Every structure is written in structure tokens, then in C-alpha cells.
Amino acid sequence: MKKLLITMIAIIMAIGLLGGCGKANGSKDTITILYPGDQSERMSEFMKNEFAQRMQKDLGMKVEMVYVPWDQYWEQKDIMLAAQEPIDLYWDGLPDLATMVNKKQASVLNDLIDKYGKDMLKVLPQEQLDGAKINGDIYGIPSAYAPSSAMYQLVCVRQDILEACGMTEIKTAEDLKLFAEKAKEQFPEMKGPADPIFKPLTRYFADEQLTWCANEDAVVYGDTTNKVYDYYETDAFKKVSLYNREMYKEGIYSDDLTTKYNERDSRVQTGLYLWVEGSLGKENEIIDSVKANAPEAVLKSYLLKPEEPRYITATGGEVLCIPQTAPNPEGAMKFINWLYSSQENYLFALYGVEGTDYEIVDGRINKLVPDEFFYEWMFRNQNYQLFAPNVDQAYIDTYQSWDDEAIISNMIGFRFNNEKVKEIEAAIKEVSGKQMAPILYGFVDFDTEYPKALQALKDAGIDEYVAEVQRQMDEFQAAKNK
């Protein structure tokens, strides 16, 4: 509690100082970026020196960063934006864009892109930006432009331990369970999986592609049937829950498992966990952090039921938004445009100073310092992306052709507007978090708890909610197919 209070005070002071400076000079020479995580020592030095000089030279402005720890980011973001703190740019997950728009946290960007974003369109094509459209207007920049089929459906495993257990690959949920059982026996110091991976397991157990499309984990869209479903009433939910229950009863799952992004990633990076949910490239994103605690670690990602089609369901998972109350929205768009305007700028922002922080050897990027700058995963762009020297060429070939045979989902670009069902949505979230999540993760008995949870969900209004999502989905597809 004391640590949280100190952090909040520090954030408020930082925002207050920045806001005071903006009001004092009354100019548009500064942008303030709200950013998740903790600022590394080298990043702090970089921002004050080389980056500050570059921003002044190229854009004639300053860039200020306000870091918020991962476990507080979303709560503090909502508080700051509601209080109209002077934030010009922030990051969030693209699937939540409609919620941010409904909260009036995101500006329409069409005019800003036309005036200040022309350079970025060379590497962020219009169809990428269309993924952030709501009612015809663009409300964010989908900042990660890279292969994305089967997003959140892969499992990133400790390949070194898998092979030490006498196994070579993972294709099924049964393979995962066998791996966990062998590892528990042969590596008792390991703590099991880092999260219950319900999305990869849903791919495995579902009869069709199911994509989450509203109210976090409660509502899914079936690509084959073209229907919206209450996820908790699908056969896949039951099968995932029963599978996870067996994992829990065998002591493979621990009581503290959640699917929260920052928590599960923090776990696996300790080097003491067997796997974590991921998307293409997950192993390369986290390997350095894992190796810091387990130098012998090797990571590899697997797709359960690999013979089944992969779907592209969104234009990436990240989005950059400019608040409606931003003091300098023009500067924020100029900054985004600058970052994507050349590979030189892109590498400078993501990796620092060439020769000091990184070097390029034979077309590969070799980091000379362990510190993070602007997060690579947040701004990843396949036109500029370089791989580390230790990444196998076979992986790069797979990565670059990953989407070649993927199917574009019928729901790509859909954003649910919850205006008519806000109270129902809140009630559903309450039931989902308190009653359905423990069932899904396998922490409680399915047969005993599910009927009670389902009745609570019905009482909350899930049927009316699903009907509203279906209505909007039908309208969206009808408009798209005109």
C-alpha cells in the first residue's frame, strides 16, 4: 500500500510539473506520452540527451515521458484522462478501442493524419489504419504492423526443458499436459505454467474459430456460423474448464495464476515457469528477460491444432491514441509520423544510438546494452524490423510467410459500441470475474459451480447483451459488403 501511494504521488507530481510548464509557456513545443512500465537507466539518459537533441532538430519540440508501472497502468490511465491531465499520447490494446472511445478517451484522427501523418502511411497502409475505425472515423493508430494470424493462440514454452523431458514439440493439449507432468517430476524447482492459456486451449477445443469481440472474455464471434455467442455457454468453454480443472487437481496449476498480461509475463521472465500464452514472435520478445534469470533457457512457440486454418482477426494488438483533452494533438501526430518516416528514426527510437546501444551486422541487429527504449513490440513494423543474430533463419522465413495462407476473419475491424448496454456490461463483468473466471482456470469444480454462475450471468442480462452485439455485427458486415 505504501509503495502504491508513493508511486501515485510521484505520477501526480510529474503530471503537475508538466502541466504547469505547458500552461506557463502556452506553446505547442512539448508533447507528453503516458507509457507503461518502468524507465530504464539508459532510456532516462537517452531521453534527456540524444533523443532530446534529435527531437529539437527534427521536430522543434520536446518529448516528455510519464511512466506508470504495469500493474497500475490501466487504472491510472483512466484516472488521469478523466481528470484531463495534460497527456498528448498513450498506448493501449486495440481490442479495447471501442471502450476508450465510449469513455471519450480518444480523438478522431482523420484530419491529423491528413495534415501530419503522410510519411507513416508508407509503412502503415490504409487497411491497417482501418482497423481502428469506428463509424467511419479513425480513433487510433494500430502501431504494430506485422504478421498476426492466430493472435493470442500460440503457446510459448521452455523448449530446453521440453527436450530435457524427452519431448520435441507440442501439437495438442494432451502434449502440454504430458510436458507439465514430466517437468514436475524431473524439474521440481519449476513452478508450472505461467497462466491457464484459455485462448490457445479454446482454439484447440472449439469446432470453429472463436474470436473475442465484446466485454473482454464474455462474448465471442464464430467465423463459420457467422454468429455471436456467450463464450461461457459454448462447448469450448466447458472443455477448457474441465481440462484446466485436471491441471489444477494434479498440482500443475498454482492458486495465483491469472491471465493478466503483466502478471503472466512477469512470471515466465523469472525463468521458473514452463509456458505462457503468446502470438507470433513472443519468444523473441521475452527471451532476454528470461535468460537474465535462466541463462540456459530456450523458448519456442507452438500452435495447438496446427493443421487447422489461422485467422487474421485484427490489425495487430496495439493502438496509440490521442486524448480528446490533449494539449498538443498536432505534436503527438508529428511524433508518430516521425518515428515511422524512416528506418533510421525507427531504430533510433526503439534501440538507441547506433554504435553505442546497438550495431547492425550482416543485416541483424545486435543490442549492446540490455536496457529497453521505446518498446519494440509496441511499434513493430515489418518494413523496418530487424532480427537479433541468434534468431534462426528458418524462424525468420516462417515469420515472414506466416500470414500467406491465413484467412481474414469476417469480423476484422468490428468495434462494439456499449452505449445501450453499459449497466448490463458492468453486471456481466462482475459475474465473469468473480464466478466464471475461477471455473475457466480450473480452480473450482465445474459441475458444482457452473449452474450457479450461469444463472447469475442470465440474471445480469447476458442474452440481451449478446443480442445487441449480434445486431451490431450484422450491421457492420452488411455495411462492409455493400
Task: Locate each region found by the language model.
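Extracytoplasmic/secretory soluble proteins
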Residues: 9-13, 17, 21-482
